[in-house]
Amino acid sequence: MAEADDIQPIVCDNGTGMVKAGFAGDDAPRAVFPSVVGRPRHHGVMVGMNQKDAYVGDEAQSKRGILTLKYPIEHGVVSNWDDMEKIWHHTFYNELRIAPEEHPVLLTEAPLNPKANREKMTQIMFETFNSPAMYVAIQAVLSLYASGRTTGIVLDSGDGVSHTVPIYEGFSLPHAILRLDLAGRDLTDYLMKILTERGYMFTTTAEREIVRDIKEKLSFVAVDYEQEMETSKTSSSIEKNYELPDGQVITIGAERFRCPEVLFQPSFVGMEAAGIHETTYNSIMKCDVDIRKDLYGNIVLSGGTTMFSGIADRMSKEITALAPSSMKIKVVAPPERKYSVWIGGSILASLSTFQQMWISKAEYDEAGPGIVHRKCF
């Protein structure tokens, strides 16, 4: 890849909820849009209107009233490759406005993903988009890079899936990675449910987006859940108003902290899983006894679902209760954690030492999609 020096690599973080894309070396993604493909529910009757058979991202969101919205990524795994291809096409041509055959591309994926997933990604990049080179990196590892560390445990929680990934000197420890299929989308669904108990009805895919906005603007994590519940019964200090698109104003109280509490008590949504604090602890306990101290001192939060205020204090409190009493515990919540996977990718792809890591088109032509397991780890 002699000619790679003058061409900026593309970094594309394909999340379950949002695609973050941009150029390596930038400090933030240029394009952030929903990972959604919408298809018309009705046939077009207006002659001369150029109706498309599919809309991607923000355009799909704005026309959501007449479309069926589908997310091609579920729980971090691509479930619909045709739609995924549309999203990538949209990213390259409409959002970044580049020719994919001219730029190396760094993609991200969730840990513990099926092997076929990254093979298919590789195949599409080289065969459909003619990329000159590509690489697939693990999301949580990139978040750690972005925080300036090489050792630590990352709790990465997005829209579709949460993970705890212990990393030592830059290597993730696969035997200790734990995955929790509980994330932002489940919190939105739970908030829809508990708002219904208050008498507000939210049912359609379009209304779900409104509830997601309520969640993002008003929710917080209680440091002491029981105590907050008691307070909210007697006082209205916690209540906030939210104006719906049609002008109606709704009031939301204890729901503000009941919603993210699911992360710590998954039984609220009928899941028999451990909460994020316990999953983090279990993940640390699966690691070698000598490195646990370094992990306890570097617990890094990443992803949009860790954006709730109060989450770092609560994490710290819960893990302190589980860990040995003399252990020093530090939970780091970087302010840019919503995009830290992308930022880590931007850092990685612009390192001079990384340039020999790319899988080139020539290597792919020789070895096939399986090469991705040999070169990306």
Swiss-Prot record:
Strongly expressed in nearly all vegetative tissues, and remains high in older tissues. Little or no expression is detected in mature pollen sacs, ovules, embryos or seeds. Subject to negative translational control in pollen. SMART domains: ACTIN. It catalyses: ATP + H2O = ADP + phosphate + H(+). Its EC number is 3.6.4.-. PROSITE patterns: ACTINS_1, ACTINS_2, ACTINS_ACT_LIKE. It is found in: Cytoplasm, Cytoskeleton. GO terms for cellular component: cytoplasm; cytoskeleton; cytosol; nucleus. InterPro entries: Actin, Actin/actin-like_CS, Actin_CS, ATPase_NBD. Its main location: cytoplasm. The modification N-acetylalanine is found at A2. Keywords: Acetylation, ATP-binding, Cytoplasm, Cytoskeleton, Hydrolase, Nucleotide-binding. GO terms for biological process: response to cytokinin; response to far red light; response to high light intensity; response to red light; root epidermal cell differentiation; root hair cell tip growth; root hair elongation. It is an enzyme of class 3 (hydrolase). It comes from the Eukaryota. One of its GO terms (molecular function) is hydrolase activity. Belongs to the actin family. Actins are highly conserved proteins that are involved in various types of cell motility and are ubiquitously expressed in all eukaryotic cells. Essential component of cell cytoskeleton; plays an important role in cytoplasmic streaming, cell shape determination, cell division, organelle movement and extension growth. This is considered as one of the vegetative actins. Polymerization of globular actin (G-actin) leads to a structural filament (F-actin) in the form of a two-stranded helix. The binding of profilin to monomeric G-actin cause the sequestration of actin into profilactin complexes, and prevents the polymerization. There are 8 actin genes in A.thaliana. This is Actin-2. It comes from Arabidopsis thaliana.
